[in-house]
Design a protein with these regions (language model features):
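Core, soluble structural subunits of large cytosolic macromolecular machines
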Residues: 10-13, 18, 161, 165-169, ...
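Long, hydrophobic alpha-helical segments that serve as membrane-spanning/inserting helices
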Residues: 211-261
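Short, small-residue-biased leader/transition segments that mark boundaries at the very start
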Residues: 3-6
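Membrane-proximal helical linkers
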Residues: 9-51
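Generic surface-pattern signal
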Residues: 15, 19, 38, 134, ...
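Divalent metal-dependent catalytic cores for phosphoryl transfer on phosphate-bearing substrates
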Residues: 33-196, 200-203, 209-213
Length: 261
């Protein structure tokens, strides 16, 4: 009926996002999330993990934790177009990036943001969710490919411009937290020794690196916020890895440990 349709129309027309909309988008049976799970299972798993980290961290500073979790679920939907080019979806020993030049690799990475924003509009995701797609990398440098380009340049000048995400930098506490959770989750998967002290070291390093590079300058996060966010990340990751290490001889702990590599 018109009465039922009016709030939906108003929300879309005036770019207001209600908790009801966010709750609907947080349902893992949402068609877009089902599509992500089917086409890019590694990215889907990563996004759920980022959601858990972001929700806890946002709660610790009194932000909108539901918004942070939902934003995290959708931040990487653009990876569905070429899932095999992203490390979390790759089979062992198969990385199509190795066949590309560093510049081409950077274009593939850049494209997941553009494609994600396109899909957000196509599926009529609220603007506040679209912001997570644009802002979760800010203007950060794709350091691995930039260094590779420098090595191959034989001393010629290589501009870092084409190896940077276009931004904008995170504008809200929630998008800034998802940027941090995204980096921390990806780094935690590479840990050979996920001891509490190593996790603490990695989390603090990643948060510090983003802060010092200026990526958080446009967000309202304070230093006290960053300290609380860091603690929240550590608590969750230590809990996850503790469960995996606890039972060294059980098959479940082995498969869980393998899944982090």
């Amino acid at each position: 009926s018109l009465h039922d349709a009016l709030p939906i129309f108003l929300e879309y027309a005036f770019n207001m996002t209600t908790d009801m909309t966010l709750l609907e988008l947080s349902d893992l049976n949402n068609p877009l999330l089902r599509q992500l799970a089917m086409q890019a299972p590694g990215t889907y798993h990563h996004s759920i993990m980022v959601g858990n980290l972001a929700e806890a961290a946002t709660e610790s500073i009194g932000g909108n934790s539901l918004l942070a979790r939902v934003g995290a679920y959708y931040h990487d939907i653009g990876k569905m177009e070429k899932p095999e080019y992203f490390v979390e979806n790759q089979q062992r020993g198969r990385n199509p990036q190795e066949k590309l030049t560093p510049t081409m690799s950077s274009l593939v990475l850049l494209n997941h943001v553009r494609k994600g924003a396109e899909m957000a509009r196509e599926f009529r995701l609220p603007k506040v969710i679209e912001a997570f797609i644009y802002e979760h990398h800010g203007t950060s440098l794709m350091n691995y490919f930039y260094q590779k380009a420098l090595e191959q340049s034989k001393g010629e000048y290589v501009s870092d411009t084409e190896f940077r995400y276009p931004g904008p930098r995170p504008q809200s506490r929630e998008t800034a937290i998802v940027m941090l959770a995204d980096a921390v989750e990806a780094m935690s998967r590479t840990l050979k020794d996920p001891s509490p002290s190593r996790i603490k070291q990695i989390v603090e390093h990643m948060v510090d690196e983003r802060f010092k590079s200026g990526e958080l300058d446009d967000s309202p996060l304070t230093l006290q916020d960053l300290s609380r966010i860091s603690d929240a990340f550590q608590k969750i990751l230590i809990g996850i890895f503790h469960r995996r290490i606890d039972y060294p001889n059980s098959p479940t702990s082995l498969s869980a440990k393998e899944s982090t590599v």
